[in-house]
């Protein structure tokens, strides 16, 4: 039985590596055949054109990585701080209107405002267009699910007696939050941080929407989409000519 389990796990592990191998094989394939025939386990025509193109564009790619790392770091830390502060307030039973506020957060999970209203707010009122903040601010409170997770964790995992004892000793709400609540909430905050970091790292749409005149602020995902479109267009043009 254990041998069968090992065989199944080995098979699944090899299966999980297949997409990575296909990407590596495609990177060494001639662009014309890659566009025409798709992915192959072994390149039909070997070529280093893709890597030569990357080396030629290395300054732009390196800058895009730096922008993405900066946006991911600032956005993740800011998201954790905002979500945890909001969730901590909503977890307090004596907060006036907490049910209404929490209901509005749940409402945003069910109904989206759409791209056009968001664009009008961030462009016309916050003036984030063509700035690096256009890559950070739109995702700060985009996911109400994280607020629900952290709020429930605060209510279920942190005994109110601890904060009450600190209040008796004269501690204020912010002191209690940063000295008691945050250290005890490392597991859920790490989970939320990972989710937010992946969101910021994989985001490419905000670059298209808010950086129409500042391509030097493109993140790596937006830049890769642009490069991929250019490569596919050139490859298709060469294939049609041949």
Regions found by a protein language model. Give the residues of each.
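A hydrophobic, multi-pass inner-membrane permease signature
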Residues: 1-242
